């Protein structure tokens, strides 16, 4: 749990009236503002503050947004027949460029297996 404090008494005079965030789970303190020995956003072990007295302050912490995973979209504006014809007649489509994993690639430079994979993944019957 994180709580905000203002140090009211301390052996180190530079800690007096300084503001900190205490993380009791990690045993750490983050300096919000202090004079002298500590700088803003410095993280120290709570034990480094020594013997202190403090008053608690209300802290409003916004939840952090975590984004995991996601999706990737490759847009190829082609007909299935065009790609199948390019597999059978590569000389007719020397400049045919498609998107694969975010990169532009010439369709004819792919292996036959990769070409079939592109066709299968691009043209599905349903989502």
Curated annotation (Swiss-Prot):
Q: Give one GO molecular function term.
A: formate C-acetyltransferase activity
| SUPFAM superfamilies xrefs | PFL-like glycyl radical enzymes
Q: Does the keyword Signal apply?
A: no
Q: Please, which domain of life does this record's source organism belong to?
A: Bacteria
- Give Gene Ontology CC terms: cytosol
Spell out the PROSITE patterns in the cross-references: GLY_RADICAL_1 (PS00850), GLY_RADICAL_2 (PS51149)
Keyword Nucleotide-binding tagged:
no
Q: Specify the Glycine radical domain's residue ranges.
A: 5-127
Q: Which InterPro entries match?
A: Auton_GlycylRad_Cofactor, Form_AcTrfase_GR_CS, Gly_radical, Glycyl_radical_cofactor_GrcA
| Glycine radical PTM sites in chain numbering | 102
Write the record's keywords in alphabetical order, separated by commas.
Answer: Organic radical
State the protein's purpose: Acts as a radical domain for damaged PFL and possibly other radical proteins.
Name by which UniProt lists this protein? Autonomous glycyl radical cofactor
Q: What is the species listed in this Swiss-Prot or TrEMBL entry?
A: Pasteurella multocida (strain Pm70)
The root-end lineage is: Bacteria, Pseudomonadati, Pseudomonadota, Gammaproteobacteria, Pasteurellales
